[in-house]
């Protein structure tokens, strides 16, 4: 209960507006420890609550105090005290001093020693301060001893009667040294009371603020829970979207792989079909030329066989007739040479677009039954690997036997032409040539402009060699002194002349077809690379040897031409076959290999300057053509004024990229080479 509420029960009845009463009450104890207690009676109650009522303990002397005030007032009071009245209901505290509405100074009641007992009695009996018949109001909180003391004080005041003078109301005047001390204590207590009230108000404010903060925190907590739920929902939605995107990407990747697999299978099958095409399409000029050449050669062979006496070549004539008339033998050969189709697993790694593969003509065999019976069937034209070289190698031993054994009367043994074996061997060689041609097609697609320059150089060399070979063959075939007559040392002119006449009948026919044969050989060797040039050159030398035999050339000329070719081949072997590094880790390593060389090997730049394009092995051509793009890129930058390090770093920076997670990675050297394809 606050002090303002306590003031509502304070006593009233003083004409000066005093609303409180200071009462001196005895307390049990010995004479040495007698304690006088002053209770705050502003609310008319005597309580023991020290928190709500001010209490002051003052020593009043050594003489025991009786319960009657009259005896005390006579001579037992040894010290005088001045008690401040409590703050009235209508007053205020200014400067820790009590100020009433009718007075500017605090009002007090003086209690003096025994000499002024009369004045004290008059003060107690004065009606202006307290009525002798006054009794404290009954209250449940008042203890019995306090009520008895109050009643005793009232009775003592009434018993004195009017004989004692009336005590006048005077201002508080202290007559002893302890009075100021007690006044200061009272002022301090009032100040403490005021501060306690202020502290109570501050505590109330603090409690209110704490309550408001707790409510605000509860609201914030609810908001945080709602926000957390929203964030969780958004994260779940994002995860579901990412999962769906990954599923779509995986599905697309599977579809793309299936499409690439189908394309690879189609490319491999088309390559197999091209390798096993046995007929010559009508739109292929090379095939038409080869067919005409083979027809002329067959006609020449027929004329030579008809001109030769049957007595000398009984077995050969039978075999030639069997070769020309046995269709079943050629069918068996074609069936045997047609390999079973098998999917090449390496074809998946060589995926490339071939739009023209779908427009290829169907497989046609020229030995079908569409030929007329009146015309001779040229079965050799339908053979895929049968060429002039094979026929010359097969027919050469028999003609040599005819020329060497012309004077003898011993019958020749029946030796059939091993057509299947020789053609099969050439089939394997030509199939490897066709494989090389397919690889060359792939190389040309990747090498672009670089391989075109190399092919131009190789064509120039091939043309020069073929022209020389053609002139040599023509000169040898046209020499009039190269006859078989000089070969016969025995002097049997009749036999020698007959043999010479028989073979001379075929010279004109062979001469007429020589230009066609030479043109075919030149065209076949013009579009191939160095290894094929050597094989075609050897084939041309062999065909020249066959022509020389037919026209009567000596074996010395054949040996000379063969030795020339072997010498040329030996010179080519002296050229270094350099192997480039595989799987380089950086552009800097590739450029160092080009300019300086790696591991003590010569640089690629020096090899190009010294040997041209002949230092590279076949497996290095494709690698060199791709890396040459980077060489050109760096060299072009150097021409524009930039340094080698800047150009190399530019290519390295081009490889850098970021993946879907933001991690920095590098693409491969192959990707970088492919990106520079336009250079």
From Swiss-Prot:
Biased segments, Acidic residues type: 433-457
Keywords, comma-separated and alphabetical: Activator, Nucleus, Transcription, Transcription regulation
GO CC, alphabetical: nucleus
Single biological process term from Gene Ontology: positive regulation of ribosomal protein gene transcription by RNA polymerase II
Localization per Swiss-Prot or TrEMBL: Nucleus
Compositional bias of kind Polar residues: 355-379, 402-411, 503-528
MF-aspect GO terms: DNA-binding transcription factor activity, RNA polymerase II-specific; RNA polymerase II cis-regulatory region sequence-specific DNA binding
Compositional bias ranges of the Low complexity kind: 422-432, 490-502, 535-546
Pfam families the UniProt entry points to: GCR1_C
Protein's UniProt name: High-osmolarity-induced transcription protein 1
Taxonomic lineage of the native organism: Eukaryota, Fungi, Dikarya, Ascomycota, Saccharomycotina
């Amino acid at each position: 209960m606050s002090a303002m509420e306590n003031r509502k029960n304070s006593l009233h009845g003083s004409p000066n507006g005093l609303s409180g009463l200071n009462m001196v009450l005895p307390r049990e104890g010995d004479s040495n420890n007698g304690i006088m207690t002053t209770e705050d009676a502003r609310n008319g109650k005597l309580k023991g609550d020290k928190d709500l009522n001010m209490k002051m303990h003052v020593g009043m002397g050594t003489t025991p105090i009786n319960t009657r005030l009259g005896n005390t007032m006579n001579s037992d009071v040894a010290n005088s005290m001045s008690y401040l009245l409590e703050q009235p209901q209508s007053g205020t505290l200014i400067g820790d001093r009590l100020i009433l509405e009718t007075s500017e100074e605090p009002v007090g009641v003086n209690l003096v020693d025994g000499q002024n007992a009369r004045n004290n009695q008059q003060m107690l009996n004065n009606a202006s301060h307290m009525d002798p018949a006054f009794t404290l109001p009954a209250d449940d909180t008042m203890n019995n001893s306090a009520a008895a003391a109050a009643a005793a004080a009232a009775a003592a005041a009434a018993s004195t009667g009017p004989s004692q003078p009336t005590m006048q109301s005077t201002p508080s005047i202290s007559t002893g040294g302890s009075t100021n001390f007690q006044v200061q204590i009272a002022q301090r207590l009032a100040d403490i009371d005021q501060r306690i009230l202020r502290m109570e108000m501050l505590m109330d404010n603090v409690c209110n603020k704490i309550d408001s903060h707790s409510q605000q925190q509860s609201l914030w907590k609810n908001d945080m829970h709602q926000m957390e739920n929203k964030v969780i929902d958004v994260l779940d939605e994002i995860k579901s979207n990412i999962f769906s995107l990954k599923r779509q990407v995986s599905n697309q990747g599977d579809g793309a792989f299936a499409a690439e697999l189908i394309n690879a299978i189609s490319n491999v099958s088309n390559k197999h079909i091209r390798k096993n095409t046995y007929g010559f399409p009508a739109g292929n000029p090379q095939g038409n030329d080869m067919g005409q050449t083979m027809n002329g050669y067959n006609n020449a062979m027929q004329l030579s066989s008809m001109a030769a006496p049957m007595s000398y070549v009984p077995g050969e004539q039978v075999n030639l007739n069997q070769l020309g008339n046995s269709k079943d033998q050629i069918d068996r050969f074609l069936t045997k040479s047609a390999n079973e189709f098998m999917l090449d697993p390496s074809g998946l790694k060589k995926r490339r677009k071939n739009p023209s593969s779908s427009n290829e003509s169907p497989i046609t065999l020229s030995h079908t039954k569409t030929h007329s019976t009146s015309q001779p069937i040229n079965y050799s034209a339908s053979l895929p690997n049968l060429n002039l070289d094979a026929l010359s190698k097969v027919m050469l031993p028999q003609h040599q036997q005819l020329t060497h054994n012309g004077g003898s009367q011993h019958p020749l043994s029946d030796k059939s032409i091993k057509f299947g074996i020789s053609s099969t061997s050439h089939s394997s060689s030509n199939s490897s040539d066709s494989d090389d041609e397919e690889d060359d097609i792939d190389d040309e697609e990747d090498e672009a402009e670089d391989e075109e320059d190399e092919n131009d150089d190789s064509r120039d060399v091939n043309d020069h060699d073929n022209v020389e070979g053609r002139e040599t063959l023509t000169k040898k075939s046209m020499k009039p002194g190269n006859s078989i007559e000089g070969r016969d040392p025995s002097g049997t002119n009749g036999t020698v002349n007959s043999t010479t006449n028989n073979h001379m009948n075929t010279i004109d026919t062979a001469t007429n077809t020589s230009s066609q044969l030479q043109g075919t050989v030149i065209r076949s060797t013009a579009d191939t690379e160095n290894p094929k040039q050597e094989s075609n050159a050897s084939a041309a030398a062999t065909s020249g040897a066959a022509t020389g035999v037919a026209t009567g050339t000596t074996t010395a000329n054949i040996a000379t031409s063969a030795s020339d070719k072997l010498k040329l081949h030996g010179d080519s072997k002296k050229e270094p076959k350099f192997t480039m590094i595989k799987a380089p880790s950086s552009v800097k390593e590739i450029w160092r290999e080009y300019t300086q060389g790696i591991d003590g090997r010569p640089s690629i730049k020096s090899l190009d300057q010294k040997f041209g394009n002949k230092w590279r092995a076949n497996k290095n051509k494709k690698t060199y053509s791709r890396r040459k793009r980077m060489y050109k890129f760096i060299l072009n930058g150097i021409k524009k004024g930039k340094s080698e390090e800047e150009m190399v770093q530019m290519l390295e920076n081009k490889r850098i990229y970021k993946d879907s997670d933001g991690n920095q990675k590098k693409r491969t050297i192959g990707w970088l080479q492919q990106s520079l394809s336009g250079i």
